[in-house]
C-alpha cells in the first residue's frame, strides 16, 4: 500500500502513541504512514507484551476509518440441517444421519422458523448448515426461493464456500454454476464460515474432510466475480500458531486486493466443549482482543472488523470496540452452532440491548443492512437507504 497523507487530526492523535517496545514503534511508523504491514510485522504484533499499545494502534486505524460509529444489524440464523459428512474435530454441531439429535428441516418448517423469534423486522437471514449426503441442490434453491417469496425485503446471506463446493460435487456441476443458480434463486451474499485456518497442517488435524484453504479462497473469488459479496473468518485458539494466523490473514488480504469482495473480517474464538478437542483450553479475553487488533492492522484493505459478541461475550466485544473492531454483529436470533460447542451467551439479543451495549462502550450505534447501508425503521418495518 502506498503512503498517503494524513489529516491534521490524525497527525495530532498519532502523537499519543507510547510504548517501550522498539519493534512496535517501527510498526507504528508504518501504520501512521499508512504503509502495508508484512508477515514479520504480524508476528511482532502477536509476540509483543505491550498489548495495550497494539490495541491503541488498531483503535487509531479504526477511528481513522469509522470514528465512533459501530455497526450492528437485526438478523436471524437458519440452520436447515445439522447432518454432516465432514466429521470435523472442531465441531459440536454436526451429526450423522442416525445420530440422536440429528435433524433436517422440511422446507415449510424452515420458512416458518424464519418468521419466529423477536418481534422486530429482521433485515438478514444468515443460512448455514451441515454437508448432508442426501439433500439435493434443489432443496437449497427451493429454500431460498421460498424465503424470497415470503420475505422479499430481507437480505439472504447463505451458504459457506464449503457448502457451495460440496453442492457442486453432489450435483456434478462446477462451483460457478452452483453460485449462479443460488444467486438466481435469491441468495444476495455469502457468509465467511468454513475458512478455519488455511494451513494444511492445521486442517489435517481439525477438519481433514473439509475443502483445503486454496479451494475456499478460489470459491470466494468465483463468488466475488459474480457480484456476490462475502465475509471472511478465521478460527483461532486451537492447534494453530502465530505463523498460521498471519499466513491466513495475508492470504485473505491477497484475494481482497484482487476482488474487493470481502465485506468484513470475523475472528472466531474456538469453543472446544463437546468436540473431540475439548481437552484444549478456551481463549482468554486478552487473546481475543489481540486477535481483533492484529486483524485490523494487517487487513488494511478490509473496511470492517467484527467483534462477534456470541463468540467472545458481550463484555469482551465492548472492549474490542477500542481494539480495532467497528462491528458487533447483530441480534443473531437462534444461534445453534457455537452454543452446541458450549457458548454461554444468549441465543439472541434484542436490538435495544445491542444499542445499549454500543453506547455503554462510548460508541455510536449504526443499524446497517448486510451491505452496510443505513436502515431506517418504522414501528414494524424498515427501509434501506441506498
Per-region residue spans from a language model:
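Hydrophobic faces of well-ordered beta-strands that scaffold small-molecule active sites
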Residues: 70-76, 125, 156-160, 190-192, ...
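Conserved short loop/turn motifs at secondary-structure junctions
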Residues: 42-46, 75-78, 129-133, 236-239, ...
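Conserved Radical SAM active-site core
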Residues: 95-233, 238-254
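Canonical Radical SAM [4Fe-4S] cluster-binding loop centered on the CxxxCxxC motif
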Residues: 64-66, 70-109
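Conserved, mostly hydrophobic/aromatic
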Residues: 34, 58, 88, 127, ...
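Auxiliary Fe-S-binding modules of radical SAM enzymes
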Residues: 1-52, 65, 118, 250, ...
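Glycine-rich, proline-tolerant flexible connector loops at the mouths of alpha/beta enzymes
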Residues: 39-42, 75-77, 95-101, 128-138, ...
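Active-site-flanking structural segment that lines cofactor/substrate pockets
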Residues: 49-73
